[in-house]
Amino acid sequence: MTPLFRKAVWLLFAVSVCAFAGSLAAQYVLGMEPCVLCISQRLCVLATALCAAVVLACKPKGRVGGLSGAVFISIPAVTGISVAAYQLWLQSLPPGAAPSCGAPWTFRLKGWPLFDWFEPVVRGFGNCAEPDYLLGVALPVWSAAYFLAVVLTVWWAWARAK
């Protein structure tokens, strides 16, 4: 792993941890109620941070190792982009025309081991079709911008690595 690629992955790890902490702060400090799709995006942010940590721990060697690391980090980021795009589509529909966004995560994961530890991360019953804003921009737009920045950064760092 080249120094540039390693620095980029460290940056992505740090930004992902901050974004995850920010999503928890928005829920538990600011009182914003996340919906099922918001929680899915939160889990994609957490997965991006964990993938970056795994890449840093494994220290991939050479161009192919960097490629595998870039792909590994990109998977949850691309998933997050698709979830954010779907939520933006739901929010663009006329009131009452949006389909349900599914069962709450707390219901889906209730019987899983260690659920009590994980439950604060997936708690939320907000409406997916009702937009929340930060600085005048819908939260799924911020989420999509974050995920796009992750993908562009990791692939830029991989392409620049020699």
From Swiss-Prot:
GO terms for biological process: protein folding. This is Disulfide bond formation protein B. Disulfide bonds join 35-38, 101-128. Residues 1-8, 61-67, 161-162 are cytoplasmic. Pfam families: DsbB (PF02600). Residues 26-43, 86-141 are periplasmic. One of its GO terms (molecular function) is electron transfer activity. InterPro entries: DiS_bond_form_DsbB/BdbC, Disulphide_bond_form_DsbB, DsbB, DsbB-like_sf. GO terms for cellular component: plasma membrane. Signal peptide: none annotated. It is a multi-pass membrane protein. The lineage of its organism: Bacteria, Pseudomonadati, Pseudomonadota, Betaproteobacteria, Neisseriales. It is found in: Cell inner membrane. Required for disulfide bond formation in some periplasmic proteins. Acts by oxidizing the DsbA protein. Its main location: membrane. It comes from Neisseria gonorrhoeae (strain ATCC 700825 / FA 1090). The chain crosses the membrane at residues 9-25, 44-60, 68-85, 142-160. Gene3D superfamilies: DsbB-like. Belongs to the DsbB family. Keywords: Cell inner membrane, Cell membrane, Chaperone, Disulfide bond, Electron transport, Membrane, Oxidoreductase, Redox-active center, Transmembrane, Transmembrane helix, Transport. It comes from the Bacteria.
